[in-house]
Design a protein with these regions (language model features):
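DUTPase catalytic domain/fold
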Residues: 1-123
Length: 123
C-alpha cells in the first residue's frame, strides 16, 4: 500500500442521527514520541458517501497524550448513519513539529506584501 496515512476503524456499532456529533473510539492507543504529533483527517469516501467527517476538521494528538484516540464524527447528512466495526472513520499521520518561542515586540519588519492577505499575492 502506497498511502502515506494510516486508517483507524470504529469499534462497536454506533448510530449517528442526522446533523449530530458523537465521539467514536478508534481502538488505537498512542504515546507519540517527543517532538511528534499525530494529525487525523476525514476519509474522503466516508465524507462523500455518508456525509460523515470529523467535527473539528482535523484531530490533533499531542506528544503528551496517552490513551485511545477518539474522533468527534459529525453526520452532515439528513439521514441516520451507521458505523460498524471495521469501518474506516479517519486517517492519521505522524508529523514532527517545532515548539515555537515567541517574543513580544512593538513593531514588525516591513515587507513588500505587508499585512496583505486573502488573495493579495495575485495567485
Amino acid at each position: 500500500d502506497q498511502a502515506d496515512l494510516f486508517d483507524s476503524q470504529g469499534n462497536p456499532i454506533i448510530y449517528l442521527p442526522p446533523h449530530s456529533t458523537r465521539m467514536i473510539g478508534t481502538g488505537l492507543c498512542f504515546a507519540p514520541p517527543e517532538g511528534w504529533a499525530i494529525l487525523g483527517f476525514a476519509r474522503s469516501g466516508l465524507a462523500t458517501k455518508k456525509g460523515l467527517a470529523p467535527a473539528n476538521k482535523a484531530c490533533v494528538i499531542d506528544e503528551d497524550y496517552r490513551g485511545q484516540a477518539f474522533v468527534p464524527l459529525h453526520n452532515h447528512s439528513d439521514m441516520s448513519q451507521e458505523i460498524v466495526h471495521g469501518d474506516r472513520i479517519a486517517q492519521f499521520m505522524f508529523v514532527p513539529y517545532y515548539q515555537a518561542q515567541f517574543d513580544v515586540v512593538d513593531e514588525l519588519d516591513e515587507t513588500e506584501r505587508g499585512a496583505g492577505g486573502f488573495g493579495s499575492t495575485g495567485k
